[in-house]
Amino acid sequence: GYVEHRPLPSHSFDAGAAWANLALQTTQAGWHAHAMAGFDRDLLRTRLGVPADYAIEAVVAIGRIGDKSLLPEALAQREIPSQRLPLEELVAEGKFAFGT
């Protein structure tokens, strides 16, 4: 039958929860999941035929971690942990206090 499409303001939260569970399950199974946000959404939408009314949040690669010594030098140099913000910049108590 007909299903009415309506905006779902919690879709990003739901996508994050789905990603977290996917990452946990792949780790449990001995695999590795790597989420990526830096990709060409328009190209992906075209190649996979994703309708315009669907949001593409991220892509995920699932596989086994390989031997880093086999990477080309340019890629090997990128294999370092990224900087993380201190918790004080991410967590607040009480009223919203960021950017004010």
Residue ranges and their predicted role:
Residues 1-100:
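Acidic, surface-exposed loops and disordered segments
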